């Protein structure tokens, strides 16, 4: 118990009289805070930024399993991290103090541990890792069913502890290969892609996360099937996919020569080989990326050639795949923790003619950042020990627990022996704007490369200093690294640092990355990673927790989730306004905002405005000074052509990028329809189009005749404080009529909250009058009828409902009905609220029609492709994988 208490900072007080032990947590104040208390303090901390406040409370504030809050603001979190890292620092020479560390973390100003470290450091409530990402893979061949299942189990075990996972499928036999079992031939890659994807979806429940990267070599005979696998609807929905492309393939694409695929891919004597048209397969990659943003491309020869860990490939550090976002190529059972340096904070006198980058302070802080990352490795080893202890104490048999235990033991060994870190950056876009430069201009690229070069040299210098003070990573050998291109650039940049590295070694096998900083950048209130600003002004909405108090609910969707909306100015754009004397309290109209943006350094530099080829060149220039990789996305307009995507991908290879991802606006919403059409003959396509038209625009004679009884779905929503209800009558499972009104009106309809379906019955009386009744089956199995829907709702609402029901019956497509509703102009706020509710109710029936990529969290078409991942600008949701 004393060992346990020491490791996890608990005090164990034994009562000799009662023979009991009282456990006291000494590393944190056990006082709990209400969410309202935390929100009030945190909102002040973030200067009124609602989104940053909610992101921090929901994702990073210290909580126990019951949801009790133990931190009231990020200041408490930063104290927690500083205290724990200072404890590790005290073990080594020249330690940093808790106060020094806190100053680096406070206000997210300089150094920001990301994700796992932020939630896990000093957190004794969770038995989880600090690592953000992992790669798994068995030793030797992994094409047996046993190996495939083992990787599946390892993937799930990591995801249940909040880790993102990547693994490579290149060792699985291609489809049709002979196997020694009852199947006789291999099923190939795709069924196992589905298996791994389904496992990810399964584990991503109840607050757990599941993020997966699947990769394959272009040399594999099933590469084309892999590339097409995600085009089938509802298949492989929980994985990112990337193709590992070698230089030989690219040269064949350029020259038009055939390319040889084989299995096994690295064997001098393959059991199967085939020559393919490289250009044709390349065009398929381009088309799919243009149509659906996948697959991503990994330039594998560049990755391996530049990889410092691969100098030790024969010692277990051979890179096989990447994490889900693609910024950390890893060997099996290695892991990485992430940290970002906030570049904007080093610009003195930002947005003025006197703007200056403080390189002296930057160098000092980068050395601290690398040191902190090494300390976090020690904390991670403690966390893994706790995981291993937890597994050992679990009641299951040793046979059941063996895979998980051995998995974490292998991860621990790699962690101890390689000590890999992921020091990165954020706020590149704001930094160059603050310096008066336009993002991705030649001057901005030169400046950004110089900053990254300084960061690389200082991070490696810090690792060398730590090797002298703490010892080098276990297998360091300067001779192995002397011809590595990245190390050679370091030697040229700082010969003395290189000589010191040869003499003392290096503490960490690899140090640098540029990772996604989705929620991190929300809290730093800056641009993300090396991305440009998304927009200077936009609308966000956040999901309201049912337990939230004193919030404004602007809408409730069909699923019953509540949302709060607010207009957001990009924080550093506001800083520019203040510096240049513009009134930040004024309510600007669209024209005024456009003029304002035009005067700023952000003009022409948003994610949709930048020169795309220059952005790729920027990535290539920065990549020269990053030993791992960079997660970044090139955002393209919907009108972008496949030829442009082709140019971007080729340019990325030529300028030294290790990977490239594009996102064309609207591509996610219509890819399935496009692909299905491309695979049919013109006659079949015409037939399909005719059938689709019949399905959307119903035959008039059939639709006009209303049955007496229609199935009905009930949708509830809320705008401001008003509760609304919609009854959607269905004919052939398609909307035929819709009635809406206030649910909490004095004469409104009160229904059980669990009720979602029923029937609408039309009664026609002898005098010609009509009445609509609603009927449902209660929980006791009895029919319950509510008579006179038309009398329950406001007459004006009822008349508009009759109008909409009419156009639905005549077969107007749902998307056009929504446009019709949206185009109606009303003076009354109540009627406009009704309009918004009807629009949301009808959107449920738009499956397969709506264009654009929607946020899986809030449902809005406001997803920004950024850092190789996706971030919703409405609710703050971000996802890689």
Residue ranges of model-derived segments:
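Short, Gly/Pro- and small/polar-rich lid/capping loops
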Residues: 498-500, 676-730
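Function-dense linear segments that define catalytic or interfacial modules
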Residues: 84-89, 104-181, 189-192, 203-206, ...
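Conserved, charged catalytic cores of large soluble enzymes
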Residues: 10-99, 181-195, 205-317, 348-352, ...
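Cys/His-rich microdomains that often coordinate metals
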Residues: 861-863, 879
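Internal maturation/activation junctions in enzymes
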Residues: 101-102, 262-266, 365-412, 416, ...
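Catalytic alpha/beta core of large soluble enzyme barrels
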Residues: 50, 55, 326-328, 380-381, ...
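Short, cysteine/histidine-rich loop/knuckle motifs that typically chelate Zn2+
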Residues: 856-860, 874
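Cysteine-rich micro-motifs
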Residues: 868-878
């Amino acid at each position: 118990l004393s060992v346990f208490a020491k490791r996890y900072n608990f005090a164990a007080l034994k009562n000799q009289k009662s023979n009991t032990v009282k456990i006291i947590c000494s590393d944190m104040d056990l006082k709990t805070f209400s969410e309202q208390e935390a929100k009030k303090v945190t909102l002040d901390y973030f200067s009124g930024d609602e989104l940053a406040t909610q992101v921090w409370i929901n994702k990073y504030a210290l909580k126990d399993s019951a949801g009790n809050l133990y931190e009231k603001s990020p200041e408490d979190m930063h104290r927690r991290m500083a205290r724990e890292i200072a404890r590790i620092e005290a073990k080594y020479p020249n330690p940093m103090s808790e106060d020094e560390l806190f100053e680096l973390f406070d206000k997210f100003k300089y150094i920001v541990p990301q994700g796992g470290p932020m939630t896990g450091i000093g957190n004794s409530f969770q038995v989880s890792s600090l690592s953000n990402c992992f790669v798994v893979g068995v030793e030797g061949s992994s094409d047996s069913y046993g190996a495939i299942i083992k990787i599946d189990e390892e993937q799930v075990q990591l995801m249940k502890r909040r880790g993102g996972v990547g693994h490579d499928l290149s060792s699985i036999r291609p489809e049709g290969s002979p196997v020694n079992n009852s199947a006789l031939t291999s099923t190939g890659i795709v069924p196992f892609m589905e298996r791994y994807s389904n496992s990810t979806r399964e584990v991503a429940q109840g607050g757990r996360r599941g993020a997966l990267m699947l990769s394959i070599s272009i040399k594999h005979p099933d590469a084309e099937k892999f590339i097409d696998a995600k085009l089938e609807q509802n298949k492989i929905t929980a994985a990112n996919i990337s193709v590992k492309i070698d230089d030989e393939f690219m040269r064949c694409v350029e020259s038009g020569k055939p390319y040889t695929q084989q299995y096994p891919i690295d064997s001098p004597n393959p059991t199967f080989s085939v020559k393919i048209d490289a250009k044709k397969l390349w065009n398929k990659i381009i088309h799919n990326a243009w149509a659906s943003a996948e697959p991503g491309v990994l330039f594998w020869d560049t990755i391996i050639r530049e990889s410092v860990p691969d100098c030790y490939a024969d010692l277990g550090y051979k890179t096989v795949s990447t994490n889900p976002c693609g910024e950390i190529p890893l060997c099996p059972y290695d892991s990485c923790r992430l940290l970002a340096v906030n570049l904007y904070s080093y610009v003195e006198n930002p947005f003025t003619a006197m703007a200056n980058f403080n390189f002296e302070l930057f160098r000092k802080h980068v050395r601290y950042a690398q040191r902190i990352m090494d300390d976090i490795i020690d904390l991670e080893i403690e966390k893994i020990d706790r995981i291993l202890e937890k597994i050992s104490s679990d009641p299951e048999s040793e046979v059941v627990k063996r895979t998980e235990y051995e998995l974490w033991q292998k991860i621990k060994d790699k962690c101890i022996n390689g000590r890999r870190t992921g020091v990165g950056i954020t706020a590149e876009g704001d930094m160059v704007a603050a310096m008066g430069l336009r993002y991705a201009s030649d001057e901005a690229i030169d400046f950004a490369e110089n900053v990254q070069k300084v960061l690389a040299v200082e991070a490696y210098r810090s690792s060398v200093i730590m090797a002298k003070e703490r010892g080098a990573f276990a297998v360091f050998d300067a001779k192995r690294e002397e011809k590595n291109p990245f190390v050679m650039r370091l030697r040229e940049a700082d010969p003395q640092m290189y000589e010191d590295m040869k003499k003392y070694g290096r503490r960490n096998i690899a140090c640098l990355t540029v990772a996604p900083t989705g929620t991190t950048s929300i809290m730093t209130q800056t641009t993300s990673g090396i991305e440009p600003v998304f927009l200077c002004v936009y609308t966000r909405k956040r999901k309201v927790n049912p337990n939230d108090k004193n919030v404004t609910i602007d809408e409730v969707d069909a699923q019953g989730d509540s949302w709060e909306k607010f207009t957001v100015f990009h924080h550093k754009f506001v800083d520019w306004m203040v510096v240049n004397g513009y009134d930040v309290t004024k309510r600007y109209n669209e024209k005024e905002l456009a003029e304002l943006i035009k005067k700023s350094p952000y003009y022409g530099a948003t994610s949709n405005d930048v020169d795309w080829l220059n952005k790729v060149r920027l990535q290539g220039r920065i990549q020269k000074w990053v030993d791992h990789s960079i997660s970044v996305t090139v955002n393209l307009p919907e009108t972008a052509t496949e030829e442009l995507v082709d140019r971007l991908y080729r340019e990325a290879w030529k300028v030294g990028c290790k990977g490239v991802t594009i996102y064309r606006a609207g591509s996610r919403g219509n890819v399935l329809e496009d692909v299905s059409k491309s695979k049919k003959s013109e006659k079949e396509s015409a037939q399909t189009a005719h059938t689709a038209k019949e399905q959307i625009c119903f035959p008039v004679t059939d639709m006009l005749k209303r049955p007496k009884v229609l199935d009905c779905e009930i949708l509830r929503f809320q705008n401001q404080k008003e509760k609304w209800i919609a009854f959607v009558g269905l004919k052939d499972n398609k909307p035929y009529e819709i009635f809406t009104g206030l649910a909490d009106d004095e004469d409104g309809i009160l229904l059980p909250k669990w009720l979602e379906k029923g029937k609408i019955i039309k009664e026609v009386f002898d005098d010609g009058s009509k009445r609509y009744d609603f009927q449902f089956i209660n929980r006791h199995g009895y029919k319950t009828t509510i008579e006179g829907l038309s009398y329950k709702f406001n007459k004006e609402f009822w008349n508009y409902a009759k109008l909409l029901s009419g156009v639905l019956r005549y077969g107007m497509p749902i998307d056009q009905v929504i446009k019709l509703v949206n185009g109606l102009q009303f003076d009354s706020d109540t009627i406009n609220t009704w309009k918004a509710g009807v629009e949301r109710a009808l959107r449920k029936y738009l499956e397969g029609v709506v264009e654009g990529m929607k946020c899986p969290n809030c449902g809005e078409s406001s997803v920004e492709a950024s850092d190789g991942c996706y971030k919703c600008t409405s609710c703050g949701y971000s996802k890689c994988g």
